[in-house]
Amino acid sequence: MSKLSLSSLDKTHLEGKKVLVRVDFNVPLNEDGQITDDTRIRAAIPTIEYLINHSAKVILAAHFGRPKGQVNEKMRLTPVAARLSELLGQNVALTNSCIGDEAVAQSNSLSNGDVLLLENVRFFGEEEKNDLEFAEKLASHADMYVNDAFGAAHRAHASTQGVTNYLSPSVAGFLLEKELKYLQGAVDSPNRPLAAIVGGSKVSSKIGVLDSLLDKCDKIMIGGGMIFTFYKARGLDVGKSLVEEDKLELAKDLEAKAKAKGVELLLPTDVVLADEFSPDANSKISQIDAISGNWMGLDIGPDSIKVFQNALAECKTIIWNGPMGVFEFDKFADGTNAIATTLADLSAFSEVCTIIGGGDSVAAVEKAGLAEKMSHISTGGGASLELLEGKTLPGVAALNDA
């Protein structure tokens, strides 16, 4: 599914044009209202600067938090406008509302190269309902549309899908284009062998991904809390480890499917156990057939790390989604950190394509200081998963075809 992208438009298309850009500025704030991680803002800079440099008038639309369709003073985009002004080295004005006469007057008064940030689109319930009247009001700010919000592309909302009915061309920004290139490329036409490392605490949240990857991968490695559902399905004692009792049959099915398709499915052979869910719990390493009593598994063990590393060494493309253990506790972060280091090394020294597919694995890689070494780090959580599941993202489908 090839979509028209911003890179195909030059100054003749953009000069003097008002361009509505949907960005993902849903950044974390601390209690003082200060941004604690500006990754998502920085990720949109290439698209914004391209438009500035090509003399467009830039109008940014974004959501922040979950204000439930009403104005919430704590969810205004004021700190985002301030940080964006710093990053761009020019003033970014913020409207009081994303629609209405006052906001439209502000967008109409822009000069070439100016940037205006519309206030939180989710202050209106119509945004998430994909209300076309609301979408038309948003679209009235601009002549054309760029979607650069991969993190919201799996939502059919007014600012991601509805506006494309009223603005043409509607194209992908640089970030969205890069996400599609890596994530779709990895599942549609990867350099093989292709491996997926799937972690996280629950099988239920990764069923779609595992099912879809079984049709595409040569190897799948599973870590995180979900492994105990697989072990219990095999009839093993898992002590007090997390288990989804209603997913035992599903775990059996996934193992059987992998076998039938000739996909190498690797589960840890040893785990790090804890006597309680706490950063300073007592811990011990155990083989998976020797877990008992009040112990719970919180990380994969050293033998499993070696097995996973050896399996990954043969691969040309690796997708990682979800941590190997409770990496927020240093004592149980070894598995996750080892995978992060292994991928960084493979990326740097063996030209392996390493894709970190959103969510907690991104946080883990950043915590380990290895983000720069990966081929691609996805900015979308749910959107990454849905793309890896082979689903069509509404915000992408709505753009003009190339």
Swiss-Prot record:
Oligomer status and interactors: Monomer.
Family as reported in the entry's similarity comment: Belongs to the phosphoglycerate kinase family.
Listed name of the protein: Phosphoglycerate kinase
EC category: transferase
GO biological process, one term: glycolytic process
GO cellular component: cytosol
Assigned keywords, A-Z: ATP-binding, Cytoplasm, Glycolysis, Kinase, Nucleotide-binding, Transferase
Lineage: superkingdom: Bacteria
Enzyme Commission number(s) from the entry: 2.7.2.3
Pfam families: PGK
Chain residues that bind ATP: K206, G297, E328, G358, G359, D360, S361
Localization per record: Cytoplasm
Reactions catalysed according to its record: (2R)-3-phosphoglycerate + ATP = (2R)-3-phospho-glyceroyl phosphate + ADP
Residues holding substrate: D24, F25, N26, R40, H63, F64, G65, R66, R122, R155
GO MF terms, alphabetically ordered: ADP binding; ATP binding; phosphoglycerate kinase activity
